[in-house]
Structure formats: C-alpha cells, structure tokens
Amino acid sequence: VMNTRAHRKITVIDGNVGFSGGFNLADEYINAKVKYGHWKDTGVMIKGEAVWNLTLMFLTTWNASLNTFEDYDKYHPRHYICPEISPNGYILPYGDSPLDNKPVGKNVYLNMINQAQKYIYIDTPYLIINDEIKNALCLAVRRGVDVRIITPGIPDKKMVFKVTRSYYEPLVNGGVRIYEYTPGFIHAKNFVCDDKIATVGTINLDYRSLYHHFENGCFMADCQA
C-alpha cells in the first residue's frame, strides 16, 4: 500500500474539455519558481467524447474511500461541444492502476516500440527499465528504427539521476541515441512514432510508474500528434 501513489494529472471542465500531461499544480511547472533550471513539460487539451474517459478516472479516484456505489452516468454531458476542426484520427485517454495486475502503460509503450518502423522519440525524466523494455529498444535499432531518448540535464533527485545514467551504456551500445536536456529538468513523458502514433501522459519510464502508481495517458493515432 505504501508503494502506490496517485500520480495522475487530470482536469475536466464541464465534461467537455479535458487536460492531462506531466504538469502538477506548482510554481516550478510554469517556471514561476526555478528549482532545477528551466522546467520542461508537456500536456494536451482534448475536447469531445474522449473527455469522458478522464472524467471516469477522476471520479473513481475521488470516490476511492467510499464503499457505496455511485451512478457515474449522471456526470455524463448531455451534449458534447466538439472542436470546430474535425479530427483526422482519434485520441484515447487511458488509465493504469496497480490494483488490477494489468500494466497498461508498459504495454502501450512496448507496443509503440515494437511497431516502430522509421523512428520513435521518447521524453522521460527517469530512465529505469527492465530487460524487456531495454531489449525492445535495442531490437528496434537493429531493424533500422531511429530510437532517441531525452532525459534531464539537471536532476530533481540526484540518486535517481545516477541510476538513470547507469542505463545509458547498454542502450547506447545497442544503438539508442540518448540526449540530456541541458537547460534544466525535463518532466515530460512523451512517445512519438513514425508521424502516426503518440502518447502524452504521466507515466515515467521507470519501474514505479509502470507497476506501482495510478497513472494515465492519452494515446493518439493518425492525427497531428
């Protein structure tokens, strides 16, 4: 129980507009307060029916301590205010929970790595991975994929930063390109692949996010991700 953490970042407005990504509600996330150099983060705004997924994730967390059942349908908007520009793909907000033994976040990341044909670019503040992900990244390079990872240049946690750097050598030896964001700390959690699919969310590329935390992300396909 002590290992689990609500790491999701969700804002829903009137059931029609949703925000998610790496941002927390703190001054350093908008660089109003500088702690680790320039703070780099990402988030997405979505409109329409996809927002309902974010609403459900928020409600299940809000009511986590209650033993009573609540009808979530009463929070469902009667009408969605859709964007003026029709999307040319789809967006699927998804959640990850340590309680169901289904590593959704890890599976999304692995599927993107394994499907990549031209490139896959990754932003992550922490890089602490198991052999399954490490091998997938190196095998992607072997089949001709341009694999690049951006990590922080200035750490927020020095010990975790040292552990992150310990993974550089086997990945670089396998052909993965790793760059450090030298102006400061990159807190973004992004995967983008082949100009076709991407995900933005809260899930770090480390063991705790992939297995122990409540997380969420937004998967995008065939749109301007």
Regions found by a protein language model. Give the residues of each.
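Charged, low-complexity intrinsically disordered terminal segments
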Residues: 1-225
